[in-house]
Structures are given as structure tokens and as C-alpha cells.
Amino acid sequence: MIFPCLFQSMLNLYAEALSTFSLLFEEAKSSSEIEPDAMMLATASLEGHPSVRTVLLKKFDARGFVFYSHLDSPKGRDLQANPQAALLFLWRSLREAGVQVRIEGRVQQVLAEEADAYFASRPRQSQIGAWASMQSCPLGSPEEFQARLAEVKAMFEGRDVPRPEEWVGFRVVPQVFEFWYGASFRLHERWRYQADAAGYWRKSLLYP
């Protein structure tokens, strides 16, 4: 049977893709997955050099998928120079043989007020760590980091820890969703949702 590409309004298909992700995410949170909110984040420099790492999804809604990091980290520098990214969720325990979700899109920083609110909700020691860590810079010894932690802890003794200016939220605004449902004998099921230049979404079934 041939499945033609389906064209609908941006609102209908985007809402369908987001709802599908939401249902799978809730299923993953109720499963044996250790960190269902862990996602691979792929970025590329302005020169096209790729890199990938695992980050945690902190929020998602109709505006996109949010995570937090330092602007001066490698991913922060990539995203400032080339604000495009891909996300990948892999939940091996779901369905017959696992579920994978890929999301591609442009990236924007969240509003400072939103980042402030999330930072204020974090454990105090995590807030202190955000100030003490020079993320991805060479570290002479574990003792050096412990000394920086103690210094920051003393600096904010008796008062709230504010968000460092360079510690920000990034939102991936989806332009592509792909849902992969694993099956026996590699007869997987793959559905792709993609926005065109005019903002309309297309849904298509892919060969595995």
C-alpha cells in the first residue's frame, strides 16, 4: 500500500506532532527509562564542524523545546554563530523495540525572565555550581574546582544566588519531527513531519 504525503495546515499537523511527542514522553516517564528527559543535542560551528552531547529537556510547549547552558560553552558558541540544532530522544524500553524521536529546528534564547524563574527553582548548590564552573575550560585539579565552589558559596552567603548573565536558556523551534518505532526484523515504522518555507507542514511515512 502506498502512503501519499499528507498536506494540512501548519496548526493541525504541528499540533499532531507535538501531541505525539507529549504522549511518548509521558509513556517514557512512566517506564523503566532512567532519564527520559535526556536528549542528544547536535550543533555545528559557523565553519560546519559538528559536535554532539547529552543535555536535559527542561520544558516543551508549542513554542519549542528548552534546555539551559552557558553562552561561553562550546554549544553556546556554536548556537550563537549558527542557530540551528538537532535533538534526539531514544527510549529503548518503549513499544516493541524502542522509540526514537528526532527534532530539527532553529534556535533562539528564552527571555531573561523565563531563565531567571527556572534558575531560581534550581537547588542552591546547583546555582552555586553555575557560578563556579567555567564550563569546558581546562581544570588543573578537582581541588581547584572545590576552592571555586567554596569561594562562590561564601560570596552569596545569606542571600539569593542570582542567575549568571551568561547562563541562559535555549529554545529549539521545530521545523522537522521524525518518529521512529522499532520493530522486529528491522521492519520499523517512521513518520516524518516537516515545515516548508511557507510554514505549512507535510506528514509522510518513510521506508525504514
UniProtKB/Swiss-Prot annotation:
Enzyme Commission number(s) from the entry: 1.4.3.5
GO biological process, one term: pyridoxine biosynthetic process
Reaction(s) the record says it catalyses: pyridoxamine 5'-phosphate + O2 + H2O = pyridoxal 5'-phosphate + H2O2 + NH4(+); pyridoxine 5'-phosphate + O2 = pyridoxal 5'-phosphate + H2O2
Cofactor note text: Binds 1 FMN per subunit.
Pathway participation: Cofactor metabolism; pyridoxal 5'-phosphate salvage; pyridoxal 5'-phosphate from pyridoxamine 5'-phosphate: step 1/1; Cofactor metabolism; pyridoxal 5'-phosphate salvage; pyridoxal 5'-phosphate from pyridoxine 5'-phosphate: step 1/1
InterPro entries: Pyridox_Oxase, Pyridox_Oxase_CS, Pyridox_Oxase_N, Pyridoxamine_oxidase_dimer_C, Split_barrel_FMN-bd
Keyword line: Flavoprotein, FMN, Oxidoreductase, Pyridoxine biosynthesis
Known cofactor(s): FMN
Top-level enzyme category: oxidoreductase
Paired cysteines (S-S): none
Pfam families in the cross-refs: PNP_phzG_C (PF10590), PNPOx_N (PF01243)
Residues holding FMN: R53, T54, V55, L56, L57, K58, Y68, S69, K75, Q100, Q135, S136, W180, R190
Keyword Oxidoreductase: yes
GO molecular function, one term: pyridoxamine phosphate oxidase activity
Record: residues binding substrate: K58, Y118, R122, S126, R186, L187, H188
Assembly and oligomerization: Homodimer.
Record function comment: Catalyzes the oxidation of either pyridoxine 5'-phosphate (PNP) or pyridoxamine 5'-phosphate (PMP) into pyridoxal 5'-phosphate (PLP).
Annotated PANTHER family: PYRIDOXINE-5'-PHOSPHATE OXIDASE (PTHR10851:SF0), PYRIDOXINE-5-PHOSPHATE OXIDASE (PTHR10851)
Family: Belongs to the pyridoxamine 5'-phosphate oxidase family.
UniProt-listed NCBIfam families: pdxH, PRK05679.1
Protein name: Pyridoxine/pyridoxamine 5'-phosphate oxidase
Organism: Xylella fastidiosa (strain Temecula1 / ATCC 700964)
Source taxonomy: Bacteria, Pseudomonadati, Pseudomonadota, Gammaproteobacteria, Lysobacterales
Gene: pdxH
